[in-house]
Structure formats: structure tokens, C-alpha cells
Amino acid sequence: MNIQTLMNELFRWCADGAPHDYSGTCDTLKTGNPETEVHKVAVSMFATPAVIRAAHEWGAELLIVHEPTFYAHMDDNFAELGNDPVYKAKRELLEKTGLAVWRYHDHPHCKFKDMISEGEVRYLELDGEWIRGPRWAVNRFHLNTPMTPRELLKRVEEKLGARHVRVSGSMDLPCTNLSL
């Protein structure tokens, strides 16, 4: 299977049968050739130099990321980056490795259930139900068992290894509805 075929399959999978105009999407191939055959695919939230190196060393031909590769939502800021040393080093690393990078952002957020939020809920082992809203709306999740922000904060720290999580408002008010 080549990169373009894989991209088309993932686009179709996220469609949920609902029409949507993706003509302005950031879900594009940032580096590489869409005709490249794919045998290994790496997936990460970010295309950091460490992730790029690890994907290349693992033998991946394609790295799928959720966030921008070159610091702007559409990754169309090359002229303004110009001779920026960080940009140049990352661009050179991608050229050296030959790794293709595809940003897969808008389609996953458009799916019910939003794929990113669904992953967060699953990883945090939250028990509840999704509340369907309009496309592109804030994702809402109803907890079956009330939880305080303090309890949720502790779970985020433990499950995700996050430190210095900030919360505003009452820390001990039991909640059942989350916006993600």
C-alpha cells in the first residue's frame, strides 16, 4: 500500500458518513512522496527531532502526527522561517532520513467520537458516555460516577505522568460533565 492509499483510507474512516468540506484542511503530507510504499507507520502527537530519529531507526516510511511539523497550523510558514536554524535542522533531518510526515488533525477531530478526546478518556480510564453535539463542537463526556477536579487532576498526573497540572475553580466540587 502506498502513502496516498493509506491516507485515503483514514480519511474515509473518519467521515462518519457525513459530508464535510475539507478543502482547507491541514491534513496534508508535509514531507515525502504520496506514492511511496508503506510497510511501517509510526504515530506521534508531535514530529520532534527525537521522534523523527526514532521512527527512522525503527524503519518507518511514514510518520503520522497530529500537530504541526513546522510551527504553524497549516505548515505554510516556510518563507517566514527562512534561515531559522531550528527549522533548517528539522528540515535537513527529514531530508536525510527520507521519512514522510503526514499531519492527521482535522479529520480525527471531526469524527464522533473525537479520536483525540476518545483516546484521552480511554487512557484516563474514565467511565461514562459521550454526549453527541454538532461537528467541531466541544466534546462532552458524562461521567457515570461524579469526580472532583482534584481527583481528575490526580488521575491525569498518575496516568499521563503530567506534572504541574493547573485547575481553576473549586477543587472539591463533584462533577459529572466534562468538556474536552
Regions flagged by a language model, labelled:
Residues M1-L180:
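Hydrophobic structural segments
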